[in-house]
Each structure stands twice: as structure tokens, then as C-alpha cells.
A protein has these predicted regions:
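N-terminal secretory signal peptides
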Residues: 1-15, 22-31, 38
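Early extracytoplasmic/lumenal segment of secretory-pathway proteins
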Residues: 42-107
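Extracytoplasmic ligand-binding site segments that recognize negatively charged/polar headgroups
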Residues: 54-55, 77, 98-237
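A ligand-binding cleft/hinge motif common to bilobed small-molecule-binding domains
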Residues: 103-108, 237, 243-261
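A bilobed periplasmic-binding-protein/Venus flytrap-type ligand-binding module shared by bacterial periplasmic
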Residues: 154-161, 195-199, 274-287, 305
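Periplasmic-binding protein-like
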Residues: 209-218, 258-282, 328
């Protein structure tokens, strides 16, 4: 979601993005904005994304270029707000843009992205209907984003320390882990955790005082705040915490790529869900290449290798899920029965909500620091 995206992102995310720098950049070239597009060929395909988040995998860019003749050029952002600003200030520059679903409708309303002709997407019918047909991506009978990957913001634990897999969010408040809990410093995410732990809807908690009190109860538990996947991995490797909030795709990479003793949990109370989509920028100068690129990105061919090689969020393409190895994280954990029903997909926040959540979290942090 990095909406809180693995994204966050999210690799946020919703951590994603919460997002990685694992991809080779030898083929996918970065440039720094409108000024550096001067002199580029008409066939150049301009992609705006988090750095290291799938679309700039060197092998994939090379394969796509060989097949289509479309040269892929990347530009990057470090936050959703920066992404929106780049689209606003550089009209007619970009072709494909990665947008967390929370921001898709806003981008469409502002005229920053255009409808996608889904008849040109060969993988359309294989996309998970719950994500593909979401009102976050579709409005007025038109599709403004193609669901690409999804993930969960929940928690992961150190399997060297905790021998029995926890099934409740209350493990974060368990006195046996006092001084051994890691927590991401993000107001929206913090309020969402507090809401879920108090039995409320994280998108619209009715009793923010209950959320505040639950978060204040973290005081004896906290070891440290964290902000990036790399930081999380270093803390875990340094044995700084037993359990910590985390992103699903990042947990898979921590275990697979860095061989850390990590297991991800989606508790019985539920967890934060997010998904990212690929959109066609308004006035895209190379729309034909853009649609081919989006179709390739959502294909099983791309996704299975991406996930197998470095680890990725879960695919929105059900056919891709079926082609993953039997022991793959995104089949064993993310594909377990009833998973979607246990997720609270984050909805777009109003400015008033964001302000309230930020003020609440800043107050809580002040108290926690005393």
C-alpha cells in the first residue's frame, strides 16, 4: 500500500512501500522529471513507480522491450503525494503509473489518469473480481486502475523466540514481550491497529478515545519504532524485538532473501488490507505500449518469476497464484481460505480524518516517550 503499502506499502503498503531497492537498474533507466525527457524517442514508455517495485526488474524490462520494441524509462516517487504532484506538474510525460487504490479515485477526479480499455488486457478475466471490480478502481462505468498486487499490514514474529504461532493481535500487548515490540511510526497505520484491537472498523473508528487508550497501553511493550523494511530487518537480525508490525510481502522477503527467522500472522481479529493498481496516465504519449506493459505486469509469466526470485506482494491475478510453487508464501499464507474476509481494505481518508489520526498519534507518541 504502501497506503500504509508494503507497501508499503507497501511496500508502504502498504510497504510496500513500504518499497524495495532489490531490482537491477541496468535496463530500467531512472530520470529526474520533465526536463530529462527532452530528446527521448517517441517509442519510449515512461513508467512512474516506487523504485525497486516490480516494474523495473531488469530481466522483465529487457524481455518486454525485445518483444514490443517499446523502450522502458522509469521515474520514481517516495510517497503518494509526490506521485500526484509529478502527474500534476508534468502533464503528457508519463504513460503508466503505479497508484495505491486509496488514491486512484482522486487521481481520476483530478484528470491525472484516463480510463483503461480493458478489451486490450488479455489477463482481465483472470483478475480477482473483488479487486478488479472494486469501486476504488472503477467509477462511472469506467476502469481507471488495473488491480496488480495486494497485501496485508499486520505483524510478524521471531520464530527463534516465540515457538507457538500467535493467532491474536493481543500478542503486541502481551506482558511476556514487554520491551520487545517493534512498531511502525505511521499515524494511519497506528490508529488502524488500535481500532482493530478494540473491535472497531479501522476505516471509521467510532471511539477514538478507546483507540488512544489502547495505543497508550503499548508503553511498557515498545522497544523501538521503525520506518523502512531495511530498518525492520536490521532490528530483527539484531534481536531487538520478538514481534513487530509488518507488511506481508516484506515478511516473505525477510525470510526468503535475508534468511531471517520470521513468520507473518493475520490474526483472528482481522488485519489491514491494501492493493495497488496500474493506471494509464492522462494524455499518455505512448498509450499502446502502456497497455501492453500493464498487461505484461499482471501476467502470470511476470509475476511468478518476480515472486519466486525476490518475493512480492500477492498477485491480483488468480491464474498467477495457481502457478506458484506449492510452498510459496503467497499460496500458503496469503492464499489460505477465508483470508479476504478477514481483511479491512483501507478506504480513502478525508483531510479531516487524516488530521485527527495524525494528532492522536502525535499525542500518543509524546506520552509514550515520557
Amino acid at each position: 500500500m504502501r497506503a500504509t503499502s508494503d507497501h508499503g506499502r507497501k511496500l508502504s503498503r502498504r510497504g510496500f512501500g513500504r518499497h524495495l531497492a532489490l531490482a537491477g537498474l541496468g535496463v530500467a533507466l531512472a530520470y529526474g522529471g520533465l526536463g530529462s525527457t527532452l530528446g527521448l524517442a517517441a517509442a519510449d514508455l515512461h513508467v512512474l513507480n516506487w523504485q525497486g517495485y516490480g516494474t523495473d526488474e531488469a530481466w522483465a524490462v529487457k524481455l518486454f522491450e525485445q518483444r514490443t520494441g517499446c523502450k522502458v524509462v522509469h521515474d520514481y516517487f517516495n510517497s503518494e503525494q509526490e506521485m500526484l504532484t509529478k502527474l500534476r506538474t508534468n502533464p503528457g510525460t508519463y504513460d503508466v503509473v503505479l497508484i495505491n487504490s486509496v488514491f486512484t479515485r482522486q487521481a481520476a477526479t483530478e484528470g491525472l489518469i484516463q480510463p483503461i480499455d480493458t478489451s486490450k488486457i488479455t489477463n482481465w478475466q483472470d483478475l480477482n473480481p473483488k479487486l478488479r471490480d472494486s469501486t476504488y478502481l472503477n467509477t462511472g462505468g469506467k476502469t481507471y486502475g488495473l488491480s496488480w498486487v495486494w497485501g496485508v499490514t499486520s505483524f510478524a514474529y521471531n520464530t527463534d523466540v516465540i515457538k507457538t504461532k500467535p493467532d491474536s493481535i493481543e500478542v503486541l500487548w502481551d506482558p511476556s514481550h514487554a520491551g520487545r515490540v517493534g512498531w511502525r511510526d505511521d499515524p494511519v497505520e497506528a490508529v488502524a491497529f488500535g481500532a482493530i484491537a478494540t473491535g472497531q472498523d479501522p476505516n471509521n473508528p467510532a471511539d477514538l478515545d478507546k483507540v488512544r487508550q489502547k495505543l497508550l497501553a503499548l508503553k511498557p511493550q515498545l522497544k523501538t519504532f521503525w520506518s523502512s523494511e531495511d530498518e525492520w530487518n536490521k532490528h530483527l537480525a539484531g534481536k531487538d524485538f520478538d514481534v513487530a508490525t509488518y507488511w506481508s510481502g516484506s515478511a516473505a522477503r525477510s525470510a526468503k532473501a535475508f534468511h531471517l527467522p520470521v513468520e507473518f500472522v493475520v490474526p483472528k481479529e482481522g488485519a489491514i488490507g491494501w492493493f495497488d493498481g496500474l493506471s494509464l496516465a492522462a494524455n499518455a504519449p505512448n498509450a499502446d505500449c502502456a497497455l501492453k506493459f500493464i498487461d505484461f505486469m499482471v501476467s502470470p509469466e511476470f509475476y511468478v518469476k518476480w515472486d519466486t526470485d525476490v518475493g512480492a506482494p500477492a498477485s491480483a491475478n488468480q491464474a498467477a497464484d495457481d502457478k506458484l510453487p506449492a510452498d510459496a508464501f503467497n499460496r500458503v499464507v496469503m492464499g489460505q481460505p477465508g483470508m479476504q474476509e478477514r481483511l479491512f481494505y483501507m478506504a480513502p481518508l478525508t483531510d479531516e480524518q487524516r488530521k485527527k489520526f495524525t494528532e492522536l498519534w502525535e499525542q500518543v507518541k509524546t506520552e509514550l516517550g515520557k
